[in-house]
From Swiss-Prot:
This is Phosphomethylpyrimidine synthase. The gene is thiC. It catalyses: 5-amino-1-(5-phospho-beta-D-ribosyl)imidazole + S-adenosyl-L-methionine = 4-amino-2-methyl-5-(phosphooxymethyl)pyrimidine + CO + 5'-deoxyadenosine + formate + L-methionine + 3 H(+). Its EC number is 4.1.99.17. Substrate binds at residues 239, 268, 297, 333, 353-355, 394-397, 433, 460. Zn(2+) binds at residues 437, 501. Belongs to the ThiC family. It comes from Shigella flexneri. One of its GO terms (biological process) is thiamine biosynthetic process. PANTHER family: PHOSPHOMETHYLPYRIMIDINE SYNTHASE, CHLOROPLASTIC, THIAMINE BIOSYNTHESIS PROTEIN THIC. Homodimer. One of its GO terms (cellular component) is cytosol. GO terms for molecular function: 4 iron, 4 sulfur cluster binding; carbon-carbon lyase activity; zinc ion binding. Binds 1 [4Fe-4S] cluster per subunit. The cluster is coordinated with 3 cysteines and an exchangeable S-adenosyl-L-methionine. InterPro entries: ThiC (IPR037509), ThiC-associated_dom (IPR025747), ThiC/Bza_core_dom (IPR038521), ThiC/BzaA/B (IPR002817).
Length: 631
């Protein structure tokens, strides 16, 4: 934790400096590689961790080494992870997907923005200094056309996005030759289908079945295609966003870049303060990962924070505004029905979802059904025109373990299943949001209920937190639940930071949350038996046993912290080659002793073999040459 708290001015200045000096940066001893596909422009980025050779013998003067293979890993950092790419936040990222979108010839450019609010903001000269300068001309589907990845998948079309994803999900594991590295324990997949090799056809089939989604708005061409589904790698979402009391555009862009560097597969912009529209534009134009939002937050800002004053018209305008900016998925709390609200009355913590509480208040105030539910088909029509995926929000999720798995939670979940089928009628991609706060023994039921009632649409959960007693450590309490539900089949985990329940996360909190959740997601992949998931673990274990300290640091999810902890007690360069660490010291290192035992056993085997040969030689009378009949 920082010893001195920065002032607001200092925080903004630091963020501005970060943006001004931003350049593509590789992790220690890593390099960016690209694997090309058959579609034009399909060039999939990965990070390859270079390893040092293993000493296998020889003398001090002439040591003998065995090379260790480089380890390819999934990389979410986009251009920010490539030192060869010049970064300019003022201009935004290259439009990777634009040629693919244009080649499909099913979209048209808009001469006028569809949102009244957008037109008002663009006409306000006072916002010129805040506004991103290189605004895109938005596109939408041509009349009568649908431009969603689900629509293409159902038509039997393998898009470049699907091929990109297939290559990416395989993580370059076909490059690994070592049997030691390729060894993997069988997993327990709970019904997930995990093919040894992921093909573009498999991606298409999963999307067509609704078991996976590709969040890819046609107005966010900068994004690198990724997939969310239980038959793929478990993904992690990071939340960022300003509020009425803290954070700025500069800081949110900094957190975006920081999030992608530390492994965020998607980012949700949950801004609720001033300049939501302008902040989101900067984020989208500089994001290599899909961006999600909760549109009701901004709609509420438009009616001065008074939930009762919300209208369908204001919400619809917000959807159009955000869809034309390029938001890839919307969280919509359409399952909070009027008749479900009384079910929360006996709860210990009531309704804890911001979106859920807003809609519950509106329903009770007007004594009418949720207008998001009433207008859900119109929402789907908008999403189908831009390929915005729907993340059906769990507005009645439990906010304490006492309220877990109650009547209100599952009533809403069943309604989300009904809405899923409606969205699929419009070829709109859907995932389902889940809890929340759930003790460990009650977690699996959440997954089985979701699969049954939501027709295997991808599940996306916030944790869940497994205990309520650890404010300041809720990244850990929730990481336990996240690993479990990821193993059971959850497709994406929404990170929780140490600041959960306490305040808005800063840059370091974002990193802590992401590292915790990358651990949870990876542990789930291992438990499911995802092909190739164990390669990095095996490489780390081999480096650890061989005291290759630099390789251990570089293989870590956070190389910098691993190195820093080691160097607190052994900072000298000699410590990087020592066959011990400060935990046990040179005489009690279990791995050093284990190596000595192994060497001793090998020597003993040789000695036993030589003794046997000697005994055999003496038994034959000491003759050097055998008689022909004996040979």
């Amino acid at each position: 934790m920082s010893a001195t708290k920065l002032t607001r001015r200092e925080q903004r200045a630091r963020a501005q400096h970060f943006i001004d000096t931003l350049e593509g940066t590789a992790f220690p001893n890593s390099k960016r590689i690209y694997i090309t596909g058959t579609h034009p422009g399909v060039r999939v980025p990965m990070r390859e961790i270079q390893l040092s050779p293993t000493l296998i013998g020889g003398s001090k003067e002439q040591p003998q080494y065995e090379e260790n293979e480089a380890i390819p890993v999934y990389d979410t950092s986009g251009p920010y992870g490539d030192p060869q790419i010049a970064i300019n936040v003022q201009q935004g990222l290259a439009k990777l997907r634009q040629p693919w979108i244009d080649a499909r010839a099913d979209t048209e450019e808009l001469t006028v923005r569809s949102s009244d609010y957008t037109r008002t903001r663009l006409a306000d000269d006072g916002l010129d200094e805040l506004r991103f300068s290189g605004l895109l001309t938005p596109k939408r589907a041509k009349t009568g056309r649908r431009v969603t990845q689900l629509h293409y998948a159902r038509q039997g079309i393998i898009t470049p996005e699907m091929e990109f994803i297939a290559i990416r999900e395989n993580m370059g594991r076909e490059r690994i030759r070592s049997e030691v590295l390729r060894h993997q324990h069988p997993g327990m997949s709970f019904g997930a289908h995990l093919p040894e090799n992921i093909t573009a056809e498999f991606v298409r089939d999963e999307v067509a079945a609704g078991r996976a989604i590709i969040p890819a708005n046609i107005n966010h061409p900068e994004s690198e295609p990724m997939i969310i589904g239980r038959n793929f790698l478990v993904k992690v979402n990071a939340n960022i966003g300003n509020s009425a009391v803290t954070s700025s555009i500069e800081e949110e862009v900094e957190k975006l870049v920081w999030s992608t560097r530390w492994g965020a597969d998607t980012v949700m912009d949950l801004s609720t303060g001033r300049y939501i529209h302008e902040t989101r534009e900067w984020i989208l134009r500089n994001s290599p990962v899909p961006i999600g939002t909760v549109p009701i937050y901004q709609a509420l800002e438009k009616v001065n924070g008074i939930a009762e004053d919300l209208t369908w018209e204001a919400f619809r305008d917000t959807l159009l505004e955000q869809a034309e900016q390029g938001v890839d998925y919307f969280t919509i709390h359409a399952g909070v029905l009027l008749r479900y609200v009384p079910m929360t009355a006996k709860r210990l913590t009531g309704i804890v979802s911001r979106g859920g509480s807003i809609m519950a208040k509106w329903c009770l105030s007007h004594h009418q059904e949720n207008f998001l539910y009433q207008h859900f088909r119109e929402i789907c029509e908008i999403c189908a025109a831009y390929d915005v995926s729907l993340s059906l929000g769990d507005g009645l999720r439990p906010g304490s373990i006492q309220d877990a798995n109650d009547e209100a939670q599952f009533a809403e979940l069943h309604t989300l299943g009904e809405l899923t089928k409606i969205a699929w009628e419009y070829d709109v991609q859907v995932m389902i949001e889940g809890p929340g706060h759930v003790p460990m023994q009650m977690i699996r039921r959440n997954m089985t209920e979701e699969l049954e009632h939501c027709h295997e649409a991808p599940f996306y959960t916030l944790g869940p937190l497994t205990t309520d007693i650890a404010p300041g450590y809720d990244h850990f309490t929730s990481g336990i639940g996240a690993a479990m539900i990821g193993w059971f089949g959850c497709a994406m985990l929404c990170y929780v930071t140490p600041k959960e329940h306490l305040g808005l996360p800063n840059k370091e909190d974002v990193k802590q949350g992401l590292i915790t959740y990358k651990i949870a997601a990876h542990a789930a992949d291992l438990a499911k038996g995802h092909p190739g998931a164990q390669i990095r673990d095996n490489a780390m274990s081999k480096a650890r046993f061989e005291f290759r300290w630099e390789d251990q640091f570089n293989l870590a999810l956070d190389p910098f912290t691993a190195r820093a902890y080691h160097d607190e007690t052994l900072p000298q360069e000699s410590g990087k080659v020592a066959h011990f660490c400060s935990m046990c010291g040179p005489k009690f290192c279990s791995m050093k002793i284990s190596q000595e035992v192994r060497d001793y056993a090998a020597a003993q085997t040789i000695e036993v073999g030589m003794a046997d040969m000697s005994e055999n030689f003496r038994a034959r009378g000491g003759e050097i040459y055998l008689h022909k009949e004996e040979a």
